[in-house]
Curated annotation (Swiss-Prot):
Group of enzyme by EC: transferase
Catalytic activity from the UniProt record: guanosine(1207) in 16S rRNA + S-adenosyl-L-methionine = N(2)-methylguanosine(1207) in 16S rRNA + S-adenosyl-L-homocysteine + H(+)
A GO molecular-function descriptor: 16S rRNA (guanine(1207)-N(2))-methyltransferase activity
Species: Pseudomonas syringae pv. syringae (strain B728a)
PANTHER family: RIBOSOMAL RNA SMALL SUBUNIT METHYLTRANSFERASE C
Gene Ontology, cellular component aspect: cytoplasm
Disulfide bridges in this chain: none
HAMAP family in UniProt: 16SrRNA_methyltr_C
Gene: rsmC
Subunit structure and binding partners: Monomer.
Designated name of the protein: Ribosomal RNA small subunit methyltransferase C
Record lineage: Bacteria, Pseudomonadati, Pseudomonadota, Gammaproteobacteria, Pseudomonadales
Amino acid sequence: MDPRSEVLLRQAELFQGSLLLVGLPADDLLGKLPDARGWCWHAGDQAALDARFEGRVDFGVEAPQTGFEAAVLFLPKARDLTDYLLNALASRLAGRELFLVGEKRGGIEAAAKQLSPFGRARKLDSARHCQLWQVTVEHAPQAVSLDSLARPYQIELQDGPLTVVSLPGVFSHGRLDRGSALLLENIDKLPSGNLLDFGCGAGVLGAAIKRRYPHNEVIMLDVDAFATASSRLTLAANGLQAQVLTGDGIDAAPMGLNTILSNPPFHVGVHTDYMATENLLRKARQHLKSGGELRLVANNFLRYQPLIEEHVGQCEVRAQGNGFKIYSAKRP
């Protein structure tokens, strides 16, 4: 069981009744708290939880409409996402209890200060390298709309400026990361047809491709509902249309692709996790048509080239700079 869940269960008497577990891990916590419900935005966690606790977990970027008498937020990595989620919960919990649990290395000690606008926060427990904090909501805020927290910015491309709109919690919120910048300089001569932007984030790659190659069918896929919501905002800001999917890795992508383009993730929360990218490299061939291309950017220190050659085809380094490489391989 996740150590954060173990800390909650040390104080199980506090978590009886109508409780909302927010950003909960895909473990057995709901089985230990039979009256609790969950809210998550990670498609993999949602699928795992729904398979075991069908109908007890809501998915998306907005707090569920179902009523709750207390809530526990599992601390996310991004401070601005924590602010949004705490606001959404506190606005519904006037006079009631709001809890925050997280790992010490995830910054729980500092994040606990984000409870102070709602009342006097106190630490209830410290164990398993985690902390549990609680506040009685004395000052319930007005709920802030998620769209009002969107952060638009412009990037200059060969065919003119592109507006990118990112939401709290999305990778490289409010700015273009170096890996995507290098990949955007190397999107020439892509195979025409169906193109997948894998791990689309705020949608910068998919939107740039759709505008540059308007006759291509562009699919944008991410495991995070805040990312796919951002991608939809980016498409709308540029008057573009594409299919946006929220799903867990390459298994959620369609078959018959001509191109897979990616700046793949390698973090889940505060933890390093290469599983989604390695799964992509192993299964890309199944999703590509013959002659289809996988093109991705990765940090220099990540040894993806042997995996690509083993599972996709001959791999070349198309470009490199700023600590990143562009890899390209075509399915025979």
